[in-house]
UniProtKB/Swiss-Prot annotation:
Gene Ontology molecular function, alphabetical: ABC-type thiamine transporter activity; ATP binding; ATP hydrolysis activity
Record-linked InterPro entries: AAA+_ATPase, ABC_SmlMolc_Importer, ABC_transporter-like_ATP-bd, ABC_transporter-like_CS, P-loop_NTPase, Thiamine_ABC_ThiQ
Name this protein carries in UniProt: Thiamine import ATP-binding protein ThiQ
Disulfide bond sites: none
PANTHER family listed in its UniProt record: SPERMIDINE/PUTRESCINE IMPORT ATP-BINDING PROTEIN POTA, THIAMINE IMPORT ATP-BINDING PROTEIN THIQ
Compartments where found: Cell inner membrane
Matches recorded under SMART domains: AAA
Organism, scientific name: Rhizobium meliloti (strain 1021)
Length: 238
């Protein structure tokens, strides 16, 4: 297995008025915060990695394998969005079961895996509940359970805590840290909060105007004063 989990090389994608360009390499088994102002290209980078958008040039390699031409379902990637992760009309266990089999062909062993996954995220006994009856934090825990039953080596978290209060954010950060330690996967997490960087990340990819302008270990990133956009993110201005 490659020691580099993710390599984005010479990737460019053009929209009507702008071209975004990305280059980065992420070591395996790390938690990487992906930060930057709204519109800096964070979600576009995730969409390219996951296969939802195709770049005009460049390549994406995951664990050394080139991803060009692979559909999202064929990539070793799970993604959790800020919201809309679950099917509201299906119970929690069924939502998690989709992570094992999209056709929901689950034998007894797989149903046990679903129950175990829910227990791991603190939702034992929630299998028959419907998503609309859950809190925002509980719904994100269900999405995490589904991601982890897939056992994909790359997990993309697109602002997973955005709708949560500070206490729930801290609980979710701790849960993700614990699950990451168990799984040994590589996590990229979009965030607008320096506290998420300090509490959870090993390193930071920082984007500004469609470019990755910094890729630093956390301590170095938190000490930077040379890039205005980073100063704004960290609240160092004024």
């Amino acid at each position: 297995m490659s020691s580099t989990a993710l390599a984005v090389k010479g990737v460019e994608i053009s929209f009507e008025t702008t071209t975004l360009a990305f280059d980065c390499a992420v070591p395996a088994k790390r938690i990487v915060a992906v930060a930057g102002a709204s519109g800096s290209g964070k979600s576009t980078l995730f969409n390219i990695i996951a296969g939802f958008e195709q770049p005009g040039r460049g390549e994406v390699r995951i664990l050394g394998e080139e991803m060009t031409g692979r559909a999202p379902a064929e990539r070793p990637v799970s993604i959790i969005f800020q919201e809309h992760n679950l099917f509201a009309h299906l119970d929690v266990a069924t939502n998690v079961g989709f992570g094992i089999s999209p056709a929901l062909r689950l034998d007894a062993a797989n149903r046990t895996k679903v129950e175990d996954a829910l227990a791991r995220v603190g939702l034992a006994g929630f299998g028959k509940r419907l998503p609309p009856t859950l809190s925002g934090g509980e719904r994100q825990r269900v999405a995490l359970a589904r991601a982890f039953v897939r056992h994909r080596p790359i997990l993309l978290l697109d602002e997973p805590f955005a709708a949560l209060d500070p206490g729930m954010r801290a609980e979710m950060r701790a849960l993700i840290s614990d699950l990451h330690e168990e799984e040994g996967n590589t996590i990229l997490m979009i965030t607008h909060h320096p506290d998420d960087v300090r509490a959870l990340a090993d390193s930071v990819l920082f984007l500004d105007r469609g470019r990755i302008v910094a890729h630093d270990e956390v301590d170095r990133f938190l000490g930077r004063r040379d890039i205005a956009a980073i100063n704004r993110f960290l609240g160092n201005e004024g």
